[in-house]
């Protein structure tokens, strides 16, 4: 029995290669940062996974913002370095500023 061709699967994997590399870079940086700062293993892995998920979509966000998608790798490393706590606080401050609230940290 002959196995069917797997060209579609290979094409799908190769199409996501750039995003996968960015996610791996963000995961590695977040994991190393968390372990260096003395974080617990579980918390570090969860934070690194969330950074990888954010970094997976960074190329699309850069395109949306009109920036070069060549910045995706360094942006992924930056995402891993600052972590999800910092990203969350940046989003909260931005939303509070847009909503006209004076202090977005108390919400």
Curated annotation (Swiss-Prot):
It comes from the Viruses. Its main location: host cell. Keywords: Cytolysis, Formylation, Host cell inner membrane, Host cell lysis by virus, Host cell membrane, Host membrane, Late protein, Membrane, Transmembrane, Transmembrane helix, Viral release from host cell. GO terms for molecular function: pore-forming activity. It is a multi-pass membrane protein. Residues 59-70 are periplasmic. GO terms for cellular component: host cell plasma membrane; membrane. The chain crosses the membrane at residues 38-58, 71-91. Residues 1-37, 92-107 are cytoplasmic. It is found in: Host cell inner membrane. GO terms for biological process: negative regulation of cytolysis; viral release from host cell by cytolysis. Induction: Expressed in the late phase of the viral replicative cycle. Belongs to the lambdavirus holin family. The C-terminus acts as a cytoplasmic regulatory region. This is Antiholin. The lineage of its organism: Viruses, Duplodnaviria, Heunggongvirae, Uroviricota, Caudoviricetes. The gene is S.
């Amino acid at each position: 029995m002959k196995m069917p061709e797997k060209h579609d699967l290979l094409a799908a994997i190769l199409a996501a290669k750039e995003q996968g590399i960015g996610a791996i870079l963000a995961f590695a940086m977040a994991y190393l940062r968390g372990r260096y700062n003395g974080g617990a293993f579980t918390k570090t892995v969860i934070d690194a996974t969330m950074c990888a998920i954010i970094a997976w979509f960074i190329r699309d966000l850069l395109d949306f913002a009109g920036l070069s998608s060549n910045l995706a790798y360094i942006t992924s490393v930056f995402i891993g370095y600052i972590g999800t706590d910092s990203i969350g606080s940046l989003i909260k401050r931005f939303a509070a500023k847009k909503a006209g609230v004076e202090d977005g940290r108390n919400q």
